[in-house]
Curated annotation (Swiss-Prot):
WD repeats lie at residues 16-59, 68-106, 113-152, 155-195, 199-240, 243-283, 285-328. GO terms for biological process: oocyte axis specification. InterPro entries: Methylosome_Comp_WDR77, WD40/YVTN_repeat-like_dom_sf, WD40_repeat_CS, WD40_repeat_dom_sf, WD40_rpt. Detected in egg (at protein level). This is Methylosome protein WDR77. The gene is wdr77. The lineage of its organism: Eukaryota, Metazoa, Chordata, Craniata, Vertebrata. Its main location: cytoplasm. Signal peptide: none annotated. It comes from Xenopus laevis. Heterotetramer; dimer of heterodimer with prmt5. Interacts with histone h2a and h4 and with nucleoplasmin.
Amino acid sequence: MSKGSAWGRPVTAPACMEVQIGAVRYRRDGALLLAASSLSSRTWGGSIWVFKDPEGAPNESLCTAGVQTEAGVTDVAWVSEKGILVASDSGAVELWEILEKESLLVNKFAKYEHDDIVKTLSVFSDGTQAVSGGKDFSVKVWDLSQKAVLKSYNAHSSEVNCVAACPGKDTIFLSCGEDGRILLWDTRKPKPATRIDFCASDTIPTSVTWHPEKDDTFACGDETGNVSLVNIKNPDSAQTSAVHSQNITGLAYSYHSSPFLASISEDCTVAVLDADFSEVFRDLSHRDFVTGVAWSPLDHSKFTTVGWDHKVLHHHLPSEGRTENLIATKAED
């Protein structure tokens, strides 16, 4: 049965951020959202943090707002301008709202609909619905205004690694799981899930993200470090590149008219592919798993990565006229 936390309870920022930073997201105005977790004794603790100036992260004293969560945080997403959706180790999906000139985070709900860790979530374009996936093999579609699950699916036979809502399509999303399957969902259909098979799909997919300009195309990362570009209408034509040597932990497209694709991995590296699927950037600065990546909406050449090494690194692509040169940089700590 679903249970909620204390509604409307304001919480002040904690004194210290956990060591392992697990997710990063930009708001449209450039504000940066971080999620952090750490293991204390036998339990995971977590927190979320907002930095109006991203250059201040992860310095706690420079945050705009922050809050301790009841368990570790696996994923976060902005909901419009004031909401923050949280995926929790506890099995809960939580919604927080930032108030009081953005100095205070207030809990709006916490719903324990998953029977295990919530690993991933994604918010649809209209900001009223979201999708989550968990270690309980389930995918759930949420009505955020009603604080309720609209639909729950069990099409995966193992834990769900990633979900991705389709930009501009409020009934379509992707999911991938440890069962090796990538599923295309359309919740309007009686049988909403369709399996997407392509030439490199004999490995376990770990991350998926939609191409921002093409609603029939998505990128996929897998456990071996491969990144693939897949057209839903012709999946056998997928392009695949061995970008990393270990598990892909995240993918993110830039805001360019011909968007770049950033990838991060457990091999502790960061890479960027251009529209021709050629590598134009690589960074080796992280000293542990890289776990989050997001592009700045204000400076399209800038993107940010975070990792279990507690680093928040801001990277800059070379000018578009020089992207044919492979760049290997060491970002500032």
